[in-house]
Regions:
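Soluble catalytic domains of membrane acyltransferases
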Residues: 12-23, 28-198, 220-221, 236-237, ...
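Phosphoinositide-dependent membrane-docking surfaces
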Residues: 50, 98, 324-354
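Structural motif
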Residues: 70, 249, 257, 323, ...
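Short hydrophobic/aromatic-rich beta-strand segments that constitute the beta-sheet cores
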Residues: 73, 260, 331-334, 356
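A conserved mid-domain beta-alpha-beta active-site/ligand-binding segment of alpha/beta enzyme cores
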Residues: 185, 196-230
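Cys/His-rich short segments
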Residues: 219-272
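Anionic N-terminal interaction surfaces
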Residues: 268-323
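Acidic, Ser/Thr- and proline-rich intrinsically disordered linker/docking segments
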Residues: 342-385
Length: 385
């Protein structure tokens, strides 16, 4: 049997060699393809904790271009279920798995363990990419973790990613993107800070409001396609799930029709909102009001949903299938019922993949047809709060 320490050392050496060979060619490609710029950053010797705002699915690649040592990434456990890509990631990178929609204390312990072994760890403390263009809230536990780690904390901000890879789209655009270190906190500084104070600092360091930046054209094709995975409530007729997209056009069966341009803004004769972020803020207020009624009757529903239980080896075990509903009382999928109070949280991966944790078990919900997962994510968040 191979010695785990020897195998671990071999893997780290392989990661260093891989980074040394590919970092500069990849950096050149990202500059050509996305107009991405960054610089190789000077960082403290030894392990450090790196906090980055989450803007695209390629964030680890963008971030890696700034550092000359391989990072260990905290990632959603779904990266272990991506076929051949997962095999490549396991061979040439190290990850710490975290289950979305859960309060994962195991991930926190693994982060501390990795730092104490001498390796730097990169994580995205918001856990979610922004739908609106404004950075999402940082997990409060992130500040406590940084203080407990007793290593330098580095905050790193990516800008332009929201338009480069809109959360609703599976197509990337070319405009302008940049990454840089915002601040380095020493262990001595962290030791005298209160978690609430540090949380405010981290939030400020990583915050981005994409629509407040100077407008830049982000060129691409089919700019509106899949926007209905983000915007599910029509401001004209007030109905849910009546919005559809095609190419650059976004419309409702009631007659509402707008186009989205290369600046991520709407165009048309009767545009209800300037951009998707404003539309989302409006529908959030409506969803909050819906949640406050806390009706026992279903508030949301979709047919053709499959529920899986996630085992420790990242296998999806079928549980049930059928209609999914969410009320103020419970989440129902097929013949499985989960009281709202038994669910720790609902996570959303990409545009429509839902996951949650209930009574210590992790679950994934898939759909046999395109459907909006964000409406469930939004409503559940307001029900719990």
């Amino acid at each position: 049997m191979d010695d785990p320490k020897i195998e671990k050392a071999k893997k780290e050496k392989r990661e260093r060699r891989f980074l040394k060979i590919w970092r500069h060619p990849v950096k050149a490609f990202l500059k050509l393809r996305f107009h991405y710029t960054c610089k190789t950053e000077s960082v403290p010797d030894g392990p450090f904790l790196l906090y980055v705002n989450h803007v695209t699915d390629l964030d680890p690649v963008f971030v890696a271009c700034s550092f000359d040592q391989p990072l260990v990434y905290v990632a959603g456990e779904n990266v272990q279920r991506m076929g051949k890509l997962s095999s490549l990631i396991r061979r040439y990178a190290s990850t710490i798995d975290r289950v979305k929609g859960s309060t994962d204390s195991i991930a926190a312990m693994n982060i501390l363990r990795t730092l104490r072994s001498g390796r730097p760890v990169c994580m995205f403390p918001s856990g979610n990419r922004s739908f609106s263009g404004k950075s999402t809230d940082i997990f409060p536990a992130s500040a406590k973790l940084a203080i407990a780690a007793k290593v330098p904390l580095i905050t790193y901000r990516l800008t332009g990613g929201y338009f480069t890879s809109p959360r609703w789209s599976d197509k990337m655009r070319c405009g302008k993107m940049h990454g840089e270190i915002v601040r380095v906190y020493t262990p001595e500084e962290l030791a005298i800070m209160q978690p609430e104070e540090l949380l405010r600092q981290i939030t400020n360091d990583l915050y981005e409001d994409a629509y407040a930046m100077e407008p830049v054209a982000y060129k691409g094709k089919k700019l509106a396609e899949r926007l209905e995975t983000m915007l599910y409530l029509c401001p004209k007729c007030g109905r849910i799930d009546t919005l559809t997209s095609k190419d650059d056009t976004f419309s409702c069966s009631c007659g509402l029709c707008v186009k989205i341009n290369e600046y991520g803004r709407f165009e048309g004769s009767n545009v209800p909102f300037e951009h998707p972020g404003m539309w989302d803020e409006w529908q959030q207020a409506k969803m909050k009001a819906l949640a406050s009624a806390a009706a026992e009757a279903p508030l949301l529903a979709d047919e053709g949903q499959q529920l899986y239980r996630l085992d420790r080896e990242h296998n999806l075990m079928p549980v049930t299938a059928g209609r999914m509903t969410l009320s103020g009382k419970e989440l129902v999928i097929g013949n499985s019922v989960f009281p709202v109070e038994s669910i720790d949280g609902i996570g959303l991966t990409q545009q429509d993949k839902l996951s949650f944790t209930s009574r210590g078990e992790n679950y994934v919900i898939r759909s046999d047809h395109p459907r909006c997962g964000k409406k469930y994510y939004d409503l559940f968040r307001y029900l719990k709060n």
